[in-house]
Amino acid sequence: LDVPTMADKPSTEVLYWVGCAASYDDRSKKVARAMVRLLKAANVDFAILGEEESCTGDSARRAGNEYLFATLAEQNVAVLNGYQEQGGIKTIVTACPHCFNTLAHEYGDFGGHYQVVHHADFLLRLLREGKLSPKRAVKGKVVFHDSCYLGRYNDIYESPRDALRDIPGLE
């Protein structure tokens, strides 16, 4: 896919946070690849952390392992803040609701204050700005699953549906 890393382009303003699921789970890898293709189609200047990205620690915290969570959070915050000091990372985009919640709401306690955007919101913005447009109609019905961390914890319900409504032919 030829995706640059922040190490290659440290002043890049949009970081695509891949997350654990998209790194290891075959179905989630498809989401990550599709997201990269969409970001490129919209001419978004973005990068990933690559091997510098660690788990956000969300699952460790939910399992009660605060030590592991803090270790991972401190490590990630050091990396992210380092790139911010070089003029990069104004926005973090992620498809993972758990990563979204952790980066946006829990890393502040470790000195990490970021503008984090769920990929549905980011894609909707690209659609509305005319930077992305569906190339063909897609016939069929679609159901969107509201994950706990996206919906109930972060009140993101409409943007995924609005983005889907912009695709001709979907019900």
Located regions from the model:
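Iron-sulfur cluster-binding electron-transfer modules in prokaryotic oxidoreductases
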Residues: 1-171
